[in-house]
Amino acid sequence: MTFFPEKKGYSLKEFHEEYSKRLSKALSQLDTKSLEEVYLQLAKGVKNNSTIFSCGNGGSSSIAEHLACDFVKGVSTDSEAKPKVFPLLSTPILTAIANDIGYEEVFAFQVERYAKENDILLSVSSSGNSENVVKAIEKAKSLDLFTISFVAFDGGRVKKISDLAIHVEVDNYGMAEDAHHALMHIFAQFLRLQSISEKEKIGKIKF
């Protein structure tokens, strides 16, 4: 099995074209049924005043944090929706748990203390095998949270144990993160669009 890039001898033009082609193909081939199901769960959670917790490592952590920005600020602007999104990514809390207990517990520890039944955990994991994400999902399910994940590569354990997973079928971390970031924007902007009561504003406000 080989992963992109498979060779050193690309020109920048060739690399750009191949990267763009593969990323575009992966996005266009996403399972639309899964997209719809995830959107409905997120919309239901927002309507029911549930908290959406988010987590991830590395580049995925930035997507999990950006989710809060675009849902809390973006979705609520000019709309009736008031999402509650809480990234489990406070540096002091993460480092305290990692130092005193173990890095594999950094998210599960917080889920156990913050979450309540019917909240949502949205996990971002390109590999699908990050131990701290797996443990967070397991803890969330034990507390009756609904679990959603964005994954890539073969989906890993995260895909298997999540209630819903959107699987971006790419074998490159950059493409996985690009696609997951796009998904975050798609869900945030679509939820905002559906929550705008003054329809005459649509087309006149920036998304």
Predicted stretch roles:
Residues 60-65, 129-136, 158:
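Short glycine/serine/threonine-rich phosphate/pyrophosphate-binding segments
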Residues 113, 121, 176-207:
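A charged, well-structured terminal subsegment
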Residues 44-115:
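Glycine-rich, small/polar surface segments that engage phosphate groups of diverse ligands
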Residues 28-48:
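A short, well-structured juxtamembrane/interface segment
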Residues 150-162:
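Short, glycine/polar-rich helix-capping loops at beta-to-alpha or helix-loop-helix junctions
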Residues 1-30:
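Generic N-terminal amphipathic, Lys/Arg-enriched alpha-helix
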Residues 89, 125, 151, 166-174:
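Short beta->alpha connector loops at strand-helix junctions that form conserved
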